[in-house]
Amino acid sequence: VVKATRKSLEEIVESVGSFSRVLNVGCGGCVSVCLAGGQQEVTELNAELRVHFKRKKEFKTVEGFTVERQCNLQFYLGLDELAESADCLLSMACGAGTQLLAERYPDKPVFPAVDTVFIGIDRAPGWYEEKCRACGECVLAYTGGICPVTRCAKGLFNGPCGGTNEGKCEVGREIPCAWYDIYVRLKEQNRLECLLSIKPRMQWKNQSQRTLIQRGFEKRYAK
């Protein structure tokens, strides 16, 4: 799922600026799982903000509300009334949730309280590892389930560069070479023929905002 990390208190305080009534909106989805923006984190951040404002003798109110999923308007029930009484909103959701919150309340300044970092897995509580860049052209079928876009420092599509040495990346001796691992994985599966065909490079240029409509919903959203 999406992984995020909380912004510094200083940056958040600077964002809310002169606004007197702050509503901090958390998300019970991805950011809750990675301990960055769920109900508990909303409570903790609000406590820090109240202490800060009290020390600075700034008279501000800080309220909190957590929706199950901030990236889906169906879960915004109960938030409208609270948002109406706030001067500004803080979002502890990922970038997508923050933007939907801003779209829902266009007359309210919305400030992110977390930085969205990557799409990844849980290795252990508090330890997360990037696995996907959401490139839109998944190549895992021929790389043994190892993503070269994410794992390779150069994002190479057709084997390792000349700097790989004993299974390590030239960027750092502690970094495994993605293509070495891909080779080992495919060899174990007797699928080394996957490496023989040349794959076209990723088309990164001229990218615009992407929209996904799943199969079966085309007619519903046809223009």
Where are these regions (language model features)?
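Short beta->alpha junction loops
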Residues: 63-71
